[in-house]
Amino acid sequence: MFNLTAASDEERAADISEMQSRLTALIGVVPGLQSITLKPDLGLVEDHWDVVLVSEHDDNAALEGYQEHPAHKEAGAFIRSVTNDRATVDYEL
């Protein structure tokens, strides 16, 4: 989950769109990455996180590879430039 730095709804929407574009581009590039989804909060309740990221990987080794992959690090650099807070949970289904 991320909180965005942008103040206006237009900037926030543009940042989310760019985040989505960069992250979905990782599918087929990062081995073991099955899917990646980025969704904005519905805005129904104040003080919620702005956006959530869910990624699915073949296994824990694929998750570790994803975290270290240069393409992921490049996408992460952009995400860090437009966010000011992050919460992460890794779990198995």
Model-derived features: positions:
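Short S/T/G/P-rich N-terminal loop/turn motif that feeds into the first structured element of a domain
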Residues: 1-50, 58-65, 91-93
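C-terminal structural segments of small proteins and small subunits
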Residues: 57-82
